[in-house]
Amino acid sequence: GLDAVAAGGVAVAGVVSAGRRAVLFTGQGSQRVGMGRELYDRFGVFAESFDRVCGLIDGELPGSLRDVVWSGGSPGALDRTVFAQAGLFAVEVALWELLRSWGVRADFFAGHSVGEVTAAYAAGMLSLEDACTLVAARGRLMQALPAGGVMAAVAASEADVCLVIEVTGAAVDVAAVNGPAAVVVSGAADEVEMVVATCRGRGWRTRSLAVSHAFHSRLMEPMLDGFRAVVAGLDWRVPAVPVVSNVSGAMADPLELVDPEYWVRHVRQPVRFADGV
């Protein structure tokens, strides 16, 4: 296993013909300065795809995406949601195009939060141009919201966390359900602290997330109308490959996915990742 990998040997051998392949694209929080740089330098397909996204999206961003992803730009620039979402999308598209060039095909696509936009592109629902427009608008409109929102991970079930929210009366939303005991809450800082303090009092582990805004919460609502106008103007096509929905946590109805209102709900409602997996 790992010893073989460390020695440069073959860790796994053989051919598997059964089973189907799912491809998952990650969401915000996984970005890091320099991500994809070695792949860019080594593989022309990756470089061409990354450059194409940057060329399409730079005009809609407050700076060069390549500069921010490669060098970080100003301190913390890549962690600003306007750049984080665009940077992840650019790297994920380039990764997928590289895999495709090697003959990899997917039977299902899924994505965590903004990663589902990459899934939509990979499934043939949007042209690259329209996908770039969506990602840029999503990040730009979220970035323009007032600061002060926070998110926290809680090691408890969704039902238990919802009960705490109800008991405290806090204006907090469940933003993601990532596992049986892995829930993220989102809202204004003082409201989330009420929930977190109660959770800690019950012996549950909690962790503050490094985010600029309270994503997938009621604090996103002021940007929804502007986002709705953007997604309504895109050319949507039914997916050529099935997509698992963040909103429902189930295989998405192809006609639902091409309804612009789905992508508005996608911003506001929790990521049902555990159900989707």
Question: Which residue ranges define each predicted feature?
Answer:
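Conserved alpha/beta-domain cores
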Residues: 11-14
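Helix-enriched interaction subdomains in cytosolic or periplasmic regions
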Residues: 1-6
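Acyltransferase
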Residues: 70-277
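Short, surface-exposed "cap/lid" segments of acyl-processing enzymes
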Residues: 17-48, 52
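N-terminal structural subdomain of ketosynthase/condensing enzymes
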Residues: 51-77
